[in-house]
From Swiss-Prot:
Hairy roots of ipd3 mutant plants expressing a constitutively active form of CCAMK exhibit spontaneous nodule formation in the absence of rhizobia. Residues 401-451 are annotated as: Disordered. The lineage of its organism: Eukaryota, Viridiplantae, Streptophyta, Embryophyta, Tracheophyta. It is found in: Nucleus. Belongs to the CYCLOPS family. Disruption phenotype: No visible phenotype under normal growth conditions, but roots of mutant plants are impaired in the interaction with both rhizobia and the arbuscular mycorrhiza (AM) fungus Glomus intraradices. Stunted growth when grown in nitrogen-limiting conditions and in presence of Mesorhizobium loti. The keyword Kinase does not apply. GO terms for molecular function: DNA-binding transcription factor activity; protein homodimerization activity; sequence-specific DNA binding. GO terms for cellular component: nucleus. This is Protein CYCLOPS.
Amino acid sequence: MEGRGFSGLYRNSSEELFLKTVMESPIGMPVPSMEMLGFKNVSQGFRADSEELFKRWLTNGEGYNSSSIGFSSRLSKRISTELVNGSNQLQVGVASDGRNNDKPFIQNNLLANDVSGDFNFPIRDPVDRELQPSNLFLAKAWFLSDQRMTRSRSSELRRRYSEMQNGLATQGIESICMDPQHGAEATKQEVANFNGYNYLSMCELPSQKGSFMSPSNSCSSNFNTPQFGDMDKVSSCVSMLKGTLQRRRLSSQLEKEAAEDDLNGIFYPQEPLFQTGFDQGQENWSNQTPVNVQVDSIGEVKDHGVLQTLEGSTNPVVDGFANQINQIYVGTASGEPSQSESSNAAPVISSGLDTCEGPINSNQTLCESSWKQVGVSKSSENTQNRVKGFREQIMDNLKDDKKRKSLERYGSITSAVSDDKGDTTKKRRVERSRKMAEAKERNSTPSVPSDMQAVLKRCENLEKEVRSLKLNLSFMNRKDSEQTKQIEDLQKQNEELADEKERLLEEIERILSETEKM
């Protein structure tokens, strides 16, 4: 019966799947949706997600303390559990009020996935769900042997595992410290709204051992590491996990932000800080002012002995940091370089904790403080020098452009081009420039009395008349010269005609004389 569930999905019809879901489920699941019937995420069931499988093993303890399940049964249930995972992704489980009215618990998608794959094991109380370290160690060993761990897959796995750890820790501390009447509802809302996943909080699994949630987010660390002690081992594991690639990514991101915002010297947040998972209807978290927060931080609020932790979901740079979990407060993860070359420093407990002033039972928790100015002195100096260099270069370019334009205007650069043009244009330009110079000289003369101005005006008019007369005389002289030339020609013709007349007369006389003789 280990292969029961939805293993025969592709050869069963939708009606059989619906009946099997309703009748075989021991935990009162809601009515299956279209995704559960196999009409949407069917193609995604062939390849099981290793990270989700790893989270389910860590959360549910490998089948609820059932060591008799073999590796073959786990492999047969991967397709069925992944198919049901698509339908219950955004649903909060139904509280089993009929079984135990005193101990309501949240049934999330992780619990429903493992139970839907194996129906031999009924639901037990949270007290009976003690996780055996041996089973968890076997699950982790099988996971490491099954999938080869590359840098990208390991970073993604560590990020998701650290998010799961932080969600469980903050929910548990909130449920302990907050009011009893608001504790259950707030925890349910936080579980329902935490990044789209539903996790069991620590307060609802009181019998979990300290080795369940290791402060280290590595895939090869020992599960028997104590949760709230021996911080040196945790820091060493975390420092071994962080690689040179993420450190370079962090430095490049910080340089980009410094280049953008360094004119004022302050980093301005690009994302909203303190994105809590509570709805707006709950007035306890309706008005919150973020204070004293740096990048990759989990803020902390103290109120005269009452501790309330706010999870800051600002992870813009490195999303693989494991936030250390202490019994009293949650610290910030610092990105200082460690001694090892290929790793970052271990997360250090931050001393810059935010405090909240006000009564304990107030509906609005007001956190007032000022932003920390991020210390980027070296990067700020570099960027300022770079900006100054750019500014000087731009000014030099503008000056060079002005000089070039002035030289072009005076003809010292484009003289060869101007020589190629015709003489007429050149003469015209020279004449125009001369006239403009004369006009400037006339305009620049000092002011004279009115009678002198009249005399000067009369003189100018006389000069104009003289010029016109000279032009007329020259024209007439030219005409006269032409006429005289014509007269001379006529006179020559007249003389020639007179000579011809005389010759003709002589010839007539000779002829008459000859006729008389005959």
